[in-house]
């Protein structure tokens, strides 16, 4: 008999060799029906896996991230099977699950079209209805290569040949289709109830621009049609809110072929950016942070010392200065460490909180670039905190509260994820345990719900990630708190303790916006371009009905500017209705309309983007109203 420990701590005994699916049935027939995959001792596996030793078990459904992943991974295989049935000469490349669904890359001597996608979708429905079992099997290296050669799958042969010697080579078979795959998958194609093919794109084999361009088909999969319908509605809404489209229409930013991945901020975009950065500075000063600035370019030796060279050099840009090798910084932390190291510190100085709005450069593949969301140059709102081990909990709690304040201001809900030690990590087991427990204790002490993401921490320490949920249900990872014992060790950081001896500080890396550019992109989509008044590039649009009101309009403009209200005027010889419509398209919070009646009464006719016509009021009354709104930072 073997002992199986369930997620709730309950221990059950079963015969050795029992399948996970059978355990799910014994736990609950309802759970068995919903089950898609399982976690055994933290590793995601198929439900058909047999258990031969005592293990911890978590049954995964579509509500779980890895359950969703398994279902969508199977969706990718169903797509490939449908394509091979219809077009046997097509060659398969790769087909993973991704956050929003899945994709598969194909080599074909014809171009996939929307009409062809409809045919493929119809074939997918047949395969789902046929309800083929997914059967895993393994082969020795040579047999695996021969199987793929027989199937004329050159890309699969290349993948196998690149695997290390001794690596397990596994395949999944479903009906007449077999694919090279590590898994996991759901038990049968019938579990994938609803599939939709979404779009087409080009993709270089292995992301290398020197390789062949393949055709990528994107899709998504759900266990219920209602969930798919909801998702498709969200996609339609997202198109209307696309920050690239709105950024152009509202004249906020642009991206040019002379600098792909390097955004240009226009005057209106800079207003939004400067407000966000000013607010960030104010709140950090209140919270006891001191701002620093570090250079963009630093000697290559620094990146070897920090460990970034071993873990990150593919994403870095390099240059040569005076016959020396330098790198443009991809992260701010090593520069911040040099600031700490520049002075001797006492335990009385700790915690020391150093903040930086630092510009970083990271090489992203051209196909991954996306507006402000994925760029090659961005400003990271970093802070690095240095503390004793005893201060970890209190400091992390303080950071969580600061992050919460920021996100609530912008109307975001969010969820929290604790990511633990990855395989590719630095440091001792003891350090990782202290660091991970420190983050857990901070979260537990304030009753913050979180989920554990095993093995997804940074290479130098565990982390807490904050995922924003926007108004149409999408999630964005922005804030992070990363505990680090490794950097202080590598840079020999110290402080003088109460005992007069040198001690090693603990370091915390953290961001709130994450990337200022990306956060602006998220806000554009969150508000659909209609920024709240305090954040709007133009807060008031001032317009006259005829030239007779021009002098009064200029006086009103001057008064608004004296009160630090951002105003634009529209004195064109156009009908007032046209001017109002244009201001509405520009998402301006308030329009002040001036006709002869307003001039005579010394008033302004106010129209609100949100509430429509508010009638005529004195300019003083309007200024008081808008200043109160700006001060309150209401959404």
UniProtKB/Swiss-Prot annotation:
EC number per UniProt: 6.1.1.3
InterPro entries documented for this protein: aa-tRNA-synt_IIb, aa-tRNA-synth_II, aa-tRNA-synth_II/BPL/LPL, Anticodon-bd, Anticodon-bd_dom_sf, Beta-grasp_dom_sf, TGS, TGS-like
Catalytic activity line of the entry: tRNA(Thr) + L-threonine + ATP = L-threonyl-tRNA(Thr) + AMP + diphosphate + H(+)
Record-annotated disulphide pairs: none
Matching CDD domains: TGS_ThrRS, ThrRS_anticodon, ThrRS_core
SUPFAM superfamilies cross-referenced by the UniProt entry: Class II aaRS ABD-related (SSF52954), Class II aaRS and biotin synthetases (SSF55681), TGS-like (SSF81271), ThrRS/AlaRS common domain (SSF55186)
Keyword DNA-binding: no
PROSITE patterns recorded: AA_TRNA_LIGASE_II, TGS
GO BP annotations listed: threonyl-tRNA aminoacylation
Cellular-component GO terms for this entry: cytoplasm
Cofactor binding comment, as recorded: Binds 1 zinc ion per subunit.
GO molecular function, a single term: catalytic activity, acting on a protein
Enzyme type, top EC level: ligase
Region annotation Catalytic: where it falls in the sequence: 242-532
Chain positions recorded as Zn(2+) binding sites: 333, 384, 509
Main localization of the protein described in the UniProt heading: cytoplasm
Pfam families reported for this sequence: HGTP_anticodon, TGS, tRNA-synt_2b, tRNA_SAD
Compartment(s): Cytoplasm
Role according to the record: Catalyzes the attachment of threonine to tRNA(Thr) in a two-step reaction: L-threonine is first activated by ATP to form Thr-AMP and then transferred to the acceptor end of tRNA(Thr). Also edits incorrectly charged L-seryl-tRNA(Thr).
Family assignment from sequence similarity: Belongs to the class-II aminoacyl-tRNA synthetase family.
Entry protein name: Threonine--tRNA ligase
The species this protein was found in: Clostridium botulinum (strain Okra / Type B1)
């Amino acid at each position: 008999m073997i002992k199986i420990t369930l997620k709730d701590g309950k221990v059950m005994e079963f015969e050795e060799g029992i399948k996970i699916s059978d355990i799910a049935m014994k736990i609950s027939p309802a759970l068995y029906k919903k089950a898609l995959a399982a976690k055994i001792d933290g590793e995601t596996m198929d439900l058909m896996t047999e258990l031969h030793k005592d293990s911890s078990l978590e049954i995964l459904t579509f509500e779980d991230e890895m359950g969703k992943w398994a279902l969508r991974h199977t969706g990718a295989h169903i797509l490939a099977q449908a394509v091979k049935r219809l077009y046997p000469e097509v060659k398969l490349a790769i087909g993973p699950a991704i956050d929003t669904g899945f994709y598969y890359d194909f080599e074909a001597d014809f171009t996939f079209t929307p009409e062809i996608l409809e045919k493929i979708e119809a074939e997918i429905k047949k395969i789902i209805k046929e309800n083929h079992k997914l059967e895993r099997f393994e082969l020795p290296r040579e047999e695996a290569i021969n199987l793929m050669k027989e199937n004329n799958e050159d890309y699969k042969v290349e993948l196998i040949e690149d695997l290390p010697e001794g690596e397990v080579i596994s395949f999944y078979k479903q009906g007449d289709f077999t694919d090279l795959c590590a898994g996991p998958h759901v038990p049968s194609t019938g579990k994938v109830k609803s599939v939709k093919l979404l779009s087409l794109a080009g993709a270089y084999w292995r992301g290398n621009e020197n390789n062949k361009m393949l055709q990528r088909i994107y899709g998504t999969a759900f266990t219920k049609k209602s969930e798919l319908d909801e998702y498709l509605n969200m996609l339609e809404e997202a198109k209307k809110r696309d920050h690239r489209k709105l950024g152009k229409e509202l004249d906020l930013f642009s991206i040019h072929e002379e600098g792909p991945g390097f955004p240009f901020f226009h005057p209106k975009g800079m207003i939004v950016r400067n407000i966000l950065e000013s607010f960030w500075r104010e709140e950090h000063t209140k919270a006891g942070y001191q701002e620093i600035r570090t250079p963009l370019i630093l000697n290559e030796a620094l990146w070897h010392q920090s460990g970034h060279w071993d873990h990150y050099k593919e994403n870095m840009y390099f240059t040569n200065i005076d016959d020396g090798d330098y790198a443009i910084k991809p992260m701010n932390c090593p520069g911040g460490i040099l600031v700490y190291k520049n002075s001797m510190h006492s335990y009385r100085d700790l915690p020391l909180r150093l903040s930086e709005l630092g510009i970083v450069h990271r090489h992203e593949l051209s196909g991954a670039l996306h507006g402000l969301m994925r760029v090659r140059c961005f400003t990271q709102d970093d802070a690095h905190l240095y503390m004793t081990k005893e201060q970890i909990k209190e400091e992390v709690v303080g950071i969580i509260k600061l992050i919460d304040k920021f996100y609530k201001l912008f109307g975001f809900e969010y969820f929290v994820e604790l990511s633990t030690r990855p395989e590719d990590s630095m440091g001792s087991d003891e350090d990782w345990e202290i660091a991970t427990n420190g983050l857990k204790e901070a979260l537990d002490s304030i009753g913050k719900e979180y989920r554990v993401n095993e093995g997804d921490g940074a290479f130098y320490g565990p982390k807490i990630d904050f995922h924003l949920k926007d108004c149409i249900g999408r999630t964005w990872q922005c804030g992070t708190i990363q505990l680090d014992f490794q950097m202080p060790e590598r840079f020999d950081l110290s402080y003088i303790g109460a005992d007069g001896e040198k001690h090693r500080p603990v370091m915390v890396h953290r961001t709130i916006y994450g990337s200022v550019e990306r956060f602006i992109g998220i806000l554009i989509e969150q508000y659909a371009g209609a920024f709240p008044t305090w954040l709007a590039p133009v807060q008031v649009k001032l317009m006259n009905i005829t030239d007779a009101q021009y002098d009064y309009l200029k006086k009103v403009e001057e008064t608004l500017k004296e009160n630090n209200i951002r105003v634009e005027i529209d004195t064109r010889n156009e009908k007032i209705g046209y001017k109002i419509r244009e201001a509405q398209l520009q998402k301006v919070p308030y329009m002040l309309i001036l006709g002869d009646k307003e001039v005579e009464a010394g008033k302004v006719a106010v129209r609100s983007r949100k509430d429509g016509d508010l009638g005529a009021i004195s300019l003083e009354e309007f200024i008081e109203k808008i200043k109160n709104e700006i001060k309150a930072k209401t959404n």
